[in-house]
Design a protein with these regions (language model features):
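Short beta-rich binding modules
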Residues: 1-185
Length: 185
């Protein structure tokens, strides 16, 4: 009997990118990546990261792909912080159309409540920082939808398993030393 080895994935054609510009979207997932090692200006840090994902109204046109006809899903990674300079805070305030009150900041904001919330996304094609030959559709702005827009409903179930690449990122999380110490007490 033959034992055949194949290259099972690297020959797949990349999906076409969604159109750049402004598009209607709905939040379809919030993934907690846990504590991740990051590097900024040569300094290594450990920060709690999350990913917010949206389905956009544009569908994938790639007949050879298993995703043909499905909505594009875009995402953005954030540090889990509502600090004054935090990108998460800036984007949430833009999406909500209003700043957080001091009481909201003190009480915190439950990101899981974003599932199913509509918005407009600014989408820009940008080269990868490491490999400029790779181009991605990045979320550059999040705005509240205009009044009267027909709301989108996520096709992705709230409790659906994250994609493989997200699971791999979660697996890279640094163990929370403080939580382990509290469990040991």
């Amino acid at each position: 009997m033959a034992l055949i080895a194949k290259d099972s994935g690297s020959n797949k054609a990349p999906l076409p990118l969604p159109e750049p510009g402004t598009t209607q979207a709905v939040c379809c997932a919030v993934w907690d990546l846990g504590l991740q090692k990051t590097s900024y200006k040569g300094e290594e840090k450990i920060q709690h990261k999350v990913i917010i994902a949206w389905e956009i109204s544009e569908t994938i046109n790639a007949p050879e792909s298993e995703y043909n006809g499905k909505r594009y899903m875009l995402n953005k990674k954030y540090t889990l912080s509502l600090g004054e300079k935090a990108n998460l805070r800036k984007d949430l305030e833009s999406w909500r159309g209003k700043p957080f009150s001091q009481q909201e900041l003190d009480n915190g904001f439950d990101l899981e409540g974003l599932y199913g919330i509509n918005c407009l996304l600014g989408v820009k094609h940008e080269p990868d920082r490491v490999d400029p030959s790779k181009v991605y559709a990045n979320v550059t702005a999040i705005l509240p939808p205009p009044k009267g827009y027909e709301k989108m409903v996520p096709e992705r179930a709230k409790d659906e398993q994250p994609p493989k690449w997200v699971l791999e990122k979660i697996a890279q999380a640094v163990p929370d030393i403080n939580a382990k110490m509290a469990e040991a007490e």
